[in-house]
Structure formats: structure tokens, C-alpha cells
Design a protein with these regions (language model features):
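Phosphate/diphosphate ligand-binding glycine-rich loop within oxidoreductases
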Residues: 1
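Short, glycine/charge-rich flexible loops or terminal/linker lids adjacent to PRPP-binding catalytic cores
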Residues: 4-42, 50-55
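PRPP-dependent phosphoribosyltransferase catalytic core
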Residues: 58-131
Length: 131
């Protein structure tokens, strides 16, 4: 959901409509909108780390008959050795931040905050567990 405001403004600046996918039973879905066959689409994301959510969105676009041109994001956190599976055509910032395994995480070692997996799919559940 973090990319919706960015997508809206990107669409406004480009003179194009902005739509979004959402999860239904943990499956990315185009619930409120439609894509015309051959319609060219750019995936707008706030942060791209692994590109998994973008891949799910690309699948939805292609199943609807659209063409995915790439990703525009605010922050590109992809790694050189694990680039996004979809080309990132524009980003405001490229950040090379470390990812840690739980046993290697310095913050975890200090007992301040437990390490959780990448992404935000289960963020609400994880936040409840740490409180």
C-alpha cells in the first residue's frame, strides 16, 4: 500500500491514470480496476528490496493482457548480486543497506528488536508480537 500515493502522483505528472493491486487471501489481485489488452503499465513502488511484490503485480498485469514496462520507485534497495527481476526504470534513491541473518544482526544481538523477514506483508502481525 505504500506505493499508492507515489503511483497517483506519478500518474498525475505523466497525465496517465493510476491504479493499484491488492491482496485477497494473500494473492495479489486487480480488484477495483481493469487493464485493457496491450495497455502499457509501469509498476510504482515506494521501496523495492527483493522485487517479489513487483513480480506478483507484473503477473496480474500480464494476466489482464497488459504489458509491464518496468518499475519506478522512490527507493531502490536491490543488490548488485540480486537485481530486481523487473527492470527499474526510475528511482529517486539507490540505497545499499545491509540485510542480516538473525544470528548476524547487531541490533538483535543487543536485544533491542528482533529481526523479521524482508517486506511488509506481515508487518502488523510482527508488530503485535514485539509489543
Amino acid at each position: 500500500m505504500g506505493g499508492i500515493v507515489y503511483a497517483y502522483e506519478l500518474g498525475r505528472q505523466l497525465g496517465k491514470r493510476a491504479i493499484f493491486t491488492e491482496r485477497v487471501d494473500n494473492v495479489m489481485t486487480l480488484k477495483r480496476f481493469s487493464i485493457k489488452p496491450g495497455e502499457r503499465c509501469i509498476i510504482a513502488e515506494d521501496v523495492v528490496t527483493t522485487g517479489i511484490s513487483s513480480l506478483e503485480t507484473k503477473r496480474v498485469i500480464e494476466e489482464a493482457g497488459g504489458v509491464c514496462l518496468g518499475i519506478a520507485c522512490v527507493v531502490d534497495r536491490t543488490k548488485a548480486d540480486a537485481p530486481s527481476p523487473i527492470p527499474i526504470v526510475a528511482s529517486a534513491a539507490k540505497l545499499d543497506l545491509p540485510n542480516y541473518l538473525p544470528e548476524e544482526c547487531p541490533i538483535c544481538a543487543e536485544g533491542k528488536l528482533p529481526l523479521v523477514h524482508l517486506g511488509s506483508r506481515k508487518m502488523k502481525e510482527q508488530a503485535k508480537q514485539t509489543l
